[in-house]
Amino acid sequence: MEWAEKYRPEHLADIVGNTSAVRQMADWAKTWTARSKPLLLYGKPGIGKTSSVYALARDMNWDVIELNASDQRTAAVIERIAGAGSTTASLTGSARKLIIMDEADNLQGTADRGGAKAILECIKNARQPIVLIANDLYGLAAELRLRCEPVQFRALPARSIAPRLKYICSSEKIACSESAVHEIAESAEGDMRSAVNMLYASAIGRQSLDGKNVHTSQKDERVSIFSLVTAVFGKTSDEELIRLSRDVDEFPEDIEQWVEGSVHTITDPAGLGLAYRSLSRADEYIGYTYRRQYHTLWRYATAVMLLGVADASAGKGIHSRILPPERWQKMSVAKKQKAIRAAVLSRLAATMQLPQATLREKYMDIITLLVDLDPETFARELALDADGLNFFLNDKSRAQEILKSLAKVEREKEPEPKKKGRKKAESPAKDADPAPAVDPVPKEELPVKSAPEERPADPPAPEEPGRKTVAHNQSTLFDGF
């Protein structure tokens, strides 16, 4: 058995790194109700997402149903497997079944036709916990992201990977030097699975391992935009900047906006002016590219913006978080609000049997006032999540508190296990005191009661001709009229 599988973590406590993500998963599982959002785990491959989900299921004693990229994930398959599993109880005695949809951002081609829509329907109707796993958060449809609770898994630092490698070497009785462990941990680039596989490949047939025997392999990965922006403002050579720009999977106009978002960190006025002139010149090249369809100009645009801003920053580095361009953030917020509004209007229209246009134009102000007066009832009847309730209340903290109280009430209503109920039913019979013995009364002393005289029944009243007898068993306000 390969070591990556042999030493896969069995419990959440065994997961290396990502402490906040693991804690978020545990809290979600302990407080899960039918109203809870599915979890969406995202992050680069090999950092423990799938292992964490299986460890969670083992800790909670939940059965598991998994669909991954190796399966056909058409609408029919998802409905038959995950859809049925999400609404039915477990046959093994487990309290719940955990539905795992791995590589949810990789629904492509005819083999996965209709899969994204089927996942949405499965989430809407689910009565069992669901976890989606993705490498790229934005590879999922926006509506799917909004219906899930995101949990980010980050790449592991080498100092977190090294102790796990030492533990494996100790378990396999292999003497491994510090240099070998350090080299493997650094080469893995945050990927625990890759580190364990490299250790396994290096240790085959050996009783000891040092730096000379280590077989490392660099994974063929694209450079992230964050690495490129950091390099632009750091002490990076021109050749290295051009190489990094070729390995980034972004268009030049997108790179330009990312770099522009961090230009404000340049404090020297002269340097700031040079940076903006470089970006302006690069923008002209990008415009020429689209107007003339001459894409060779892209290379000039990239070189001008990167080398110009790097020269302006003078290698002083960037000392703040690298954030997406502000325009993108505003567009993302607007898109999210639009999706929430559309979902709320759709539910209201279906409940009230009115067209969405009529609701939006005539009744939204009144409904908003009613929701503010009794948010619990509306949240329960319309199955609103935090975003949907906040759409009416415009108070996110209040919306979350209301949903927490509703979830607590639902958990209290859940039936207890049958064994406890049976014990409670049997306990009164065991604890009850026996009835006191009563001396029987002799038959001679028992008083004899005479049967009451039967009175002849009154003759029925004669019915009027042409009139039927009506029963006066009124069950509603309008009976008898």
UniProtKB/Swiss-Prot annotation:
Pfam families registered for this protein in UniProt: AAA, RCF1-5-like_lid
Annotated stretches, region: Disordered: 408-481
Basic and acidic residues: bias regions: 408-433, 441-457
Biased composition (Polar residues): 471-481
Statement: the UniProt record of this protein carries the keyword ATP-binding: yes
Gene label: rfcL
Entry protein name: Replication factor C large subunit
Function: Part of the RFC clamp loader complex which loads the PCNA sliding clamp onto DNA.
PANTHER family: CHROMOSOME TRANSMISSION FIDELITY FACTOR 18, REPLICATION FACTOR C SUBUNIT 1
A GO biological process held by the record: DNA replication
Keywords linked to the UniProt accession: ATP-binding, DNA replication, Nucleotide-binding
InterPro entries: AAA+_ATPase, ATPase_AAA_core, P-loop_NTPase, Rep_factor-C_lsu, RFC_lid
Family according to the record: Belongs to the activator 1 small subunits family. RfcL subfamily.
Binding sites annotated in the UniProt record for ATP: G43, K44, P45, G46, I47, G48, K49, T50
